[in-house]
């Protein structure tokens, strides 16, 4: 494997030995406001208030709220390995573990495992966030502090990270042209150019994008016997404005209030800024997270996220169902109970399609038969019509190299 300090091809993540500040050495307080320990303890009071607010506004069947926060270790040149931490249940931790406590995702998962006790009714998951500005770390084989993942680390990631954010106000993290993808749609909402030789920051890495992450998972499955990168995809706004789901382009209010401005300013580059640093021009209106849950409650939605029955959009409220099976007939599309048929004969989005039992009975290999898919999509009535439905296939060849192909399976007139 690659060692720290070795030269790697352009767009490949270079493991780096980073040292992160701990709260004891960080100027959390204003002068005269007390010791860092005092300010650190005060943060628990704020976290307790957020937990109370989540419970106060949670109304099963009407509005579901979760206690959650953003874990935000920073990297050089504005990069970050951010993750959203979302809790469910009772007896949640008294302290929100931050990047001043732990410097890597592995340490975060370990800390949360120790403080969120499933036996006491507490559960959690983490969601990779703003991956396109992670300088390749999210789907690399290395942690933030330059250490390789162990098998135990991968198992922890598999358990605690079932979904990933692929679209938000700072662009798309699904795929990028020139980074293992030839799909023209991968040029959508890109804010950085692919890395050139010698670049280690401020550019797009192949392991910053979800499609490559899924393919890395296939490689790891061959090596480890399990796939720690089996995840569903969601979108989000990341505006920090408190207006969840407000992703309309025609009513764009930008990020965090301070960046809001007239269109003429947003479309003007700031002299000397790199494109990805120009917050005004290179913001989208944000994305949406969709979850197929049995009911609008914490337990139902959280369980659906754990089983990865989720999808992302770049803002429109598109309806989407997707199933995989071994024997779907074309007539399913005309069936009045198509979803029930697909559910009975296959697995939904995020599921795992097991080997074909009928092929085993006939003493055939599952590889000799191809899986079948059922997909149904409906446009947002307040947005543009749907143009096409595509199926993207990723695989690993006999030499361990990853590939992907894109096929149109339905197109508009």
Feature annotation, model-predicted:
Residues 1-142:
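A metal-dependent hydrolase metal-coordination microenvironment
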Residues 39, 51-54, 69-76, 116-124, ...:
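C-terminal functional module detector
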């Amino acid at each position: 494997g690659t060692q720290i300090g070795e030269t790697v091809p352009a767009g490949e993540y270079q493991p780096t030995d980073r040292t992160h500040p701990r709260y004891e050495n960080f100027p959390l307080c204003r002068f005269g406001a007390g010791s860092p320990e005092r300010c650190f303890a005060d943060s628990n009071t704020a976290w307790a208030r957020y937990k109370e607010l989540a419970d106060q506004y949670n109304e099963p069947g009407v509005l579901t709220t979760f206690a959650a926060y953003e874990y935000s270790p920073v990297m050089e040149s504005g990069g970050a390995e951010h993750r959203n931490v979302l809790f469910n249940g009772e007896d949640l931790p008294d302290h929100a573990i931050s990047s001043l406590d732990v410097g890597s995702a592995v340490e975060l998962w370990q800390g949360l495992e120790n403080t969120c006790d499933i036996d006491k009714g507490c559960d959690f998951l983490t969601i990779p966030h703003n991956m396109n500005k992670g300088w390749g770390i999210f789907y690399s084989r290395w942690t933030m502090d330059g250490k390789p993942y162990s098998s135990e680390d991968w198992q922890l990631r598999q358990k605690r990270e079932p979904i990933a954010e692929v679209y938000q106000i700072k662009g798309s993290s699904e795929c990028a042209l020139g980074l293992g993808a030839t799909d023209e749609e991968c040029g959508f909402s890109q804010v950085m150019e692919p890395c050139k030789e010698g670049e280690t920051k401020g550019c797009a890495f192949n392991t910053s994008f979800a499609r490559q992450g899924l393919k890395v998972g296939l490689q790891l499955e061959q090596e480890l016997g399990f796939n720690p990168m089996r995840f569903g995809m969601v979108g989000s706004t990341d505006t920090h404005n408190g207006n969840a789901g407000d992703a309309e382009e025609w009513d764009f209010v930008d990020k965090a209030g301070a960046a809001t401005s007239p269109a003429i300013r947003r479309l003007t580059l700031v002299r000397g800024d790199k494109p990805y640093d120009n917050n005004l021009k290179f913001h989208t209106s944000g994305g949406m997270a969709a979850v197929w849950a049995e009911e609008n409650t914490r337990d139902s939605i959280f369980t659906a996220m754990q089983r990865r029955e989720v999808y992302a959009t770049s803002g429109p409220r598109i309806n989407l169902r997707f199933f995989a099976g071994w024997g779907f007939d074309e007539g399913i599309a005309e069936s009045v109970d198509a979803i029930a048929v697909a559910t009975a004969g296959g697995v939904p989005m995020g599921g795992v399609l097991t080997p074909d039992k009928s092929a085993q009975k006939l003493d055939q290999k599952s590889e000799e038969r191809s899986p079948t898919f059922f997909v149904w999509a409906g446009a947002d009535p307040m947005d543009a019509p749907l143009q096409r439905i595509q199926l993207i296939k990723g695989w690993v060849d006999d030499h361990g190299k990853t590939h992907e192909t894109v096929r149109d399976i339905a197109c508009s007139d």
